[in-house]
């Protein structure tokens, strides 16, 4: 606050000036404000250095977490006998069983492809003389698609109608081949590969009674396209779910076919060149005919890299810890966090866990060189990790990989101590009462029941595929029952009879919110991936769908699991480092508040002091003026008397 300029304490004494007040204020600020400023700067520096340490600590924690996670040991790599342009490729997910396989591809899956005869104009009419309409029916994958044309329908319109009716399952296009005179052709291509995707034709459609009726106008349209139907075969479209082929084989330019290959000598057939049902987490892609061997191996590269990341992160952390906690006895200088127990204990806590010895289940060789199960004591020194004189870690990757290869199971147990898996507990959707009545034999007579074709319903567990289309004696399985509960129980019994170790199926009753029915429940020990595959419609009737459940290991207390917990005690919400950081923040906030209030008090005091002395000086100036007036009067009187 400004009150004017205070020059001196009246009468020219010069005792109290503004400069004197400023010096008094500066001295008090130095005594009372500077300690706050210094402490705030010290805490801010501590917090900055602590933030750097926390960042390094979190990087180290990330490296530890990856080694505490058992999935790092489940990583796999595939080594193929042919690397350039192989006949097949294999990819696998983590956890797939280590194995070798021989694949011999003898035939690739193909789509079905037809082309019409040459057309002069892509916008020409299919049949300009057509009276009324004509119905053309196409079949593929057991489904039928009927399109209706009239005299105004062009070839492009026909292609669009086929695409729309089939929902893209049959792809129709008008292509320009460049042929003279008739450069355009209508082509049909099945969306998917495989024999079941084969396209067939019927000149007509199904009537209101469900009977197929021929249409001579449709026959003419097919003939005009070059697709005259070969009706010599005995075909029942309703029963066979397919129509006729064409007479002109030259216009059937590619025939739908399944892929054929052998897996370790076993003949296999698939509708696609991408095979995903050989085992959970495995995808085989067929590229061309030929033979190739695959070896699924443990991927040590990922574990080795994780170890090196751990070492690098720790050494980076130690560099920051040394700078922040160092003390030089000769110079007396010390790091900003020297003497802070929460920080000083970081290194010792980490090393205590990291180099702790632990007894785990492992193997050893007996006198005859045979491996026998036993308890073994391990430490990180056994895996190539050591602490050098500088206090940093060193890592011998070759020693590490050799030790892991010797006994991967004991390594996994030592690192993360995974001893069990989450149980599998999968329950299907509700099968509402009455939804399976068409398969029942309620009167004790014959019944069609529900038959599964190969691949309609399969279960994959412990890397084995179980096809439910067959009984244990190899005969075809038919699902029957007098009641829906009995029918479903027969299904559960059939699955359980497969002897799938670790997996059980049961039927559960359901009665909630006025909905009654049953559900199928699958339970297991969770040590293997579990999947259900098959025909979507059949599975849906049974309250199921394609599903893949990956086994989930439960984390134990191996070396890195324990170290992970220790680090969490430092960096977690209630961790020691977190709490210390919060205390610094609170201290800085409190110090700033005290500093501001003290500064305000000092400012008020010296503003008041300056104001008071200005008032004193004003009074003294008035008195001085009065004194001068009296003095002048006296002097004037004296002069007049003289």
From Swiss-Prot:
The keyword Secreted applies. GO terms for cellular component: bacterial-type flagellum filament cap; bacterial-type flagellum hook; extracellular region. Its main location: secreted. The keyword Repeat does not apply. It comes from the Bacteria. Keywords: Bacterial flagellum, Coiled coil, Secreted. It is found in: Secreted; Bacterial flagellum. Residues 614-641 form a coiled coil. InterPro entries: Flagellin_hook_IN_motif (IPR010810), FliD (IPR040026), FliD_C (IPR010809), FliD_N (IPR003481). One of its GO terms (biological process) is cell adhesion. Transmembrane segments: none annotated. Homopentamer. Required for the morphogenesis and for the elongation of the flagellar filament by facilitating polymerization of the flagellin monomers at the tip of growing filament. Forms a capping structure, which prevents flagellin subunits (transported through the central channel of the flagellum) from leaking out without polymerization at the distal end. Belongs to the FliD family. This is Flagellar hook-associated protein 2. It comes from Campylobacter jejuni subsp. jejuni serotype O:2 (strain ATCC 700819 / NCTC 11168). The lineage of its organism: Bacteria, Pseudomonadati, Campylobacterota, Epsilonproteobacteria, Campylobacterales. The gene is fliD.
């Amino acid at each position: 606050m400004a009150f004017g300029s205070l020059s001196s304490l009246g009468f020219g004494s010069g005792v109290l000036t503004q400069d004197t007040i400023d010096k008094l204020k500066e001295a008090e600020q130095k005594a009372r404000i500077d300690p706050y400023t210094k402490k705030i700067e010290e805490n801010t520096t501590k917090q900055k250095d602590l933030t750097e340490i926390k960042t390094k600590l979190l990087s180290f924690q990330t490296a530890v977490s990856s080694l505490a996670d058992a999935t790092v040991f489940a990583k796999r790599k595939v080594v193929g006998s042919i690397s350039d342009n192989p006949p097949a490729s294999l990819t696998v997910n983590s956890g797939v069983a280590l194995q070798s396989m021989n694949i011999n591809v003898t035939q690739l899956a193909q789509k079905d492809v037809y082309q019409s005869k040459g057309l002069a104009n892509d916008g020409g009419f299919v049949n300009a003389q057509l009276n009324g309409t004509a119905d053309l029916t196409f079949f593929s994958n057991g489904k039928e698609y009927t399109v209706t044309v009239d005299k105004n329908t062009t070839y492009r319109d026909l292609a669009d109608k086929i695409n729309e009716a089939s929902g893209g399952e049959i792809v129709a296009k008008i292509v320009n081949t460049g042929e003279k005179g008739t450069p355009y052709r209508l082509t049909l291509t099945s969306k998917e590969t495989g024999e079941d995707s084969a396209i067939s034709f019927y000149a007509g459609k199904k009537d209101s009674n469900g009977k197929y009726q021929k249409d001579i106008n449709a026959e003419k349209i097919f003939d005009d396209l070059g697709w005259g139907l070969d009706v010599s075969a005995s075909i029942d479209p309703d029963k066979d779910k397919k129509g006729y082929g064409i007479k002109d084989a030259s216009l059937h330019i590619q025939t739908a076919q399944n892929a054929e290959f052998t897996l370790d000598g076993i003949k296999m057939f698939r509708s696609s060149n991408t095979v995903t049902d050989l085992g959970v987490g495995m995808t085989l892609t067929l590229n061309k005919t030929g033979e190739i061997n695959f070896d699924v191996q443990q991927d040590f590269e990922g574990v080795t890299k994780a170890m090196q990341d751990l070492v690098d992160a720790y050494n980076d952390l130690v560099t920051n810890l040394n700078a922040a906690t160092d003390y030089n006895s000769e110079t007396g200088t010390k790091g900003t966090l020297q003497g802070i127990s929460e920080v000083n204990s970081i290194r010792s806590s980490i090393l205590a866990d990291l180099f702790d010895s632990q007894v785990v289940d492992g193997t050893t060789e007996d006198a005859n060189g045979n491996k026998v199960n036993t308890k073994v004591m391990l430490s990180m020194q056994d895996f190539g990790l050591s602490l050098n004189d500088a206090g940093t870690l060193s890592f011998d990757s070759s020693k590490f990989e050799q030790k892991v290869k010797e006994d991967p199971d004991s390594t996994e147990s030592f690192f993360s101590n995974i001893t069990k898996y989450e149980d599998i507990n999968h329950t299907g959707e509700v099968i509402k009462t009455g939804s399976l009545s068409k398969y029942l034999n309620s009167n004790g007579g014959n019944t069609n029941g529900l038959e599964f074709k190969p691949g309609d319903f399969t279960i994959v567990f412990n890397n084995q595929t179980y096809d439910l289309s067959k009984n244990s004696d190899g005969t075809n399985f038919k699902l029957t029952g007098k009641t829906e509960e009995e029918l479903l129980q027969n299904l559960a019994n059939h699955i359980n009879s497969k002897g799938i170790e670790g997996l059980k199926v049961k039927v559960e009753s359901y009665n909630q919110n006025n909905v009654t029915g049953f559900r199928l429940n699958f339970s297991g020990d969770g040590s293997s991936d579990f999947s259900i595959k098959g025909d979507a419609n059949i599975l849906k009737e049974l309250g199921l769908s394609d599903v893949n459940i990956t086994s989930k290991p439960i984390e134990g207390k191996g070396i890195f699991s324990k170290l992970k917990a220790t680090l969490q005690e430092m960096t977690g919400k209630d961790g020691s480092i977190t709490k210390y950081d919060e205390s610094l923040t609170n201290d800085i906030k409190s110090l700033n508040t005290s500093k501001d209030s003290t500064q305000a008090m000092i400012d008020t005091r010296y503003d008041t002091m300056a104001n008071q002395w200005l008032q004193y000086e004003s009074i003294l100036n008035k008195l001085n003026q009065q004194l001068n007036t009296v003095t002048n009067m006296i002097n004037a009187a004296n002069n007049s008397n003289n």
